[in-house]
């Protein structure tokens, strides 16, 4: 039995407030309406953990507050973010963003692939190169078994935020891909927490 009805999805927004230019924002997007552990409880969890770690380090005096505001957004894939961008009043659109979708897979699940997909071609491509540099530097410090793979833009719904209609580059970071195809449990009940790398 199926019935149609009008519902709603929440858009959750959290900030790490910028110090010098707080009106300038960098966004971290992770869709929240899919039920899988990797796709995409992982992206939402990373947003929460990033905000917690950054605010903790700032409070302890170990790092300065970032120059620009970092906004973490969790919403229904594609539609929640676009509705937010079209209806929430702001002085300007974000400078850049990143889409966190399907992360944290054990290297055995994703063949050790950490994938960085470019923003949509007509947006500012420098963000692709900065992100690639940062990821390579991070993997050089500590690496649980990943190799960075870069690739061209893939329209995953959320990455379309880079369209000039919205006006900011938004690459995609993921462990979605394997050497051949995508991880085995993609969009299935097999997408469970035991497929995710433990933080210990």
What role is predicted for each listed range?
Residues 37-45, 125, 196-199:
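Soluble non-cytosolic domains of exported or imported proteins
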């Amino acid at each position: 039995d199926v019935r149609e009805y009008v519902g709603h999805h929440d858009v959750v927004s959290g900030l790490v407030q910028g110090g010098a230019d707080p009106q300038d924002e960098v966004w971290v997007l992770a869709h929240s309406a899919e039920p899988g552990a990797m796709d995409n409880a992982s992206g939402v969890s990373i947003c929460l953990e990033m905000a917690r770690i950054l605010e903790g380090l700032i409070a302890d005096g170990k790092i300065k507050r970032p120059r620009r505001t970092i906004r973490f957004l969790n919403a229904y894939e594609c539609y929640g973010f676009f509705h937010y961008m079209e209806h929430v009043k702001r002085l300007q659109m974000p400078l850049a963003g990143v889409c966190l979708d399907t992360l944290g897979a054990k290297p055995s699940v994703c063949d050790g692939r950490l994938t960085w997909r470019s923003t949509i071609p007509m947006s500012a491509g420098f963000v692709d190169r900065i992100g690639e540099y940062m990821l390579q530097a991070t993997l050089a410090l500590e690496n649980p078994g990943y190799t960075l793979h870069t690739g061209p833009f893939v329209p995953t719904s959320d990455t379309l935020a880079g369209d000039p209609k919205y006006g900011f580059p938004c690459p995609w970071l993921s462990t979605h891909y394997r050497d051949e195809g995508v991880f085995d449990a993609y969009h299935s009940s097999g997408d469970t927490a035991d497929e995710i790398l433990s933080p210990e």
